[in-house]
């Protein structure tokens, strides 16, 4: 194989390596946890990822002791938990 062909192959492999994590990204393991309202009694609007619905859902958070499936906004929830095939 010529040096030009090797450079092309190397370039394609590099591009594939860079793009693969974006296209096959999986959600964080905490996204499978049930929503945890916490022990406190504050009424804070929060979002959690609901795997059965494959979307983020609003819930009322008590204000402390949250698990990893707890987000301040729908956008943050979707960024962390939605899969990108």
Curated annotation (Swiss-Prot):
Keywords attached to this entry: Disulfide bond, Ion channel impairing toxin, Neurotoxin, Potassium channel impairing toxin, Presynaptic neurotoxin, Secreted, Signal, Toxin, Voltage-gated potassium channel impairing toxin
Q: Which Gene Ontology terms of cellular component type are present?
A: extracellular space
The UniProt transmembrane annotation reads none
Q: Please report a single Pfam family linked to this protein.
A: Kunitz_BPTI
- Reported tissue expression: Expressed by the venom gland.
Major location, coarse class? secreted
Matching SUPFAM superfamilies? BPTI-like
Does the keyword section mention Electron transport? no
One Gene Ontology molecular-function label? potassium channel regulator activity
Q: Where is the BPTI/Kunitz inhibitor domain?
A: 31-81
List all disulphide bridges recorded for this chain: 31-81, 40-64, 56-77
Q: Where is the signal peptide?
A: 1-24
Q: What family does the database annotate?
A: Belongs to the venom Kunitz-type family.
Name this protein carries in UniProt: Kunitz-type serine protease inhibitor homolog beta-bungarotoxin BF B1 chain
Organism of this sequence: Bungarus fasciatus (Banded krait)
Query: What does the record give as the organism's lineage?
Result: Eukaryota, Metazoa, Chordata, Craniata, Vertebrata
């Amino acid at each position: 194989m010529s040096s030009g062909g090797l450079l092309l192959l190397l370039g394609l492999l590099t591009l594939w390596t860079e793009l693969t994590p974006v296209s096959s990204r999986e959600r964080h393991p905490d996204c499978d946890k049930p929503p945890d309202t916490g022990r406190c009694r504050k009424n804070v609007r929060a979002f959690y990822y609901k795997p059965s619905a494959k979307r983020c859902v609003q819930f009322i958070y008590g204000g402390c002791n949250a698990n990893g499936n707890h987000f301040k906004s729908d956008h943050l929830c979707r960024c962390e938990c939605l899969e990108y095939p």
